[in-house]
């Protein structure tokens, strides 16, 4: 591996088998990066992390079952990564987290709202007070949010994030291309 701040490598390097969608990457409090991706056809979500900060990589390990897209990754106030994985069709949102920064992953639990179907993997970010915020879009086009009650503490219930609807695009659905929107004259 080249030294930090050094030049880029001259070519791409093989990083594993084919992925079913774009991967996601995040750093944790140990200084290591973790990459998450889904297998072809969404057969499962997998993660691969650096063995040591700025070093080589451990093997791919299963992160969750069937997945619509690579899990969303966010670091919490304690420096531990949290992963949010949505099943195809959006009926189940799973949540897993590192037990310690750079450490093993907790088996996790279901994280979604009963009876609410989501259209895409949510987004998550840490605020200035150390609370993690998760945002998701429902199949009705409504944005929902769930926030930690305090840094690294329990979660508050899901709530509406405003009353404006957005245009939901189901995960895995083809996006509208520019040539489909505009006809040449």
What is each model feature region?
Residues 1-185:
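A structural motif
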């Amino acid at each position: 591996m080249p030294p930090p701040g050094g030049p880029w490598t001259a070519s791409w390097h093989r990083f594993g088998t084919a992925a079913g969608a774009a991967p996601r990457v995040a750093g944790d409090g140990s200084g290591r990066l973790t990459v998450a991706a889904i297998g072809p056809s969404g057969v499962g979500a997998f993660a691969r992390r650096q063995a040591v900060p700025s070093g080589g990589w451990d093997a791919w390990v299963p992160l969750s079952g069937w997945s619509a897209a690579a899990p969303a990754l966010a670091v919490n106030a304690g420096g531990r990564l949290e992963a949010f994985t949505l099943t195809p069709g959006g009926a189940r949102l799973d949540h897993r987290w590192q037990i310690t920064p750079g450490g093993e992953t907790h088996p996790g639990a279901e994280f979604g709202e009963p009876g609410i179907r989501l259209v895409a993997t949510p987004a998550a970010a840490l605020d200035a007070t150390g609370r993690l915020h998760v945002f998701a879009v429902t199949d009705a086009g409504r944005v929902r949010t769930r926030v930690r009650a305090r840094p690294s503490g329990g979660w508050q219930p899901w709530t509406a994030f405003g009353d404006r609807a957005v245009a939901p695009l189901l995960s895995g659905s083809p996006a509208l291309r520019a040539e489909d929107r505009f006809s040449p004259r």
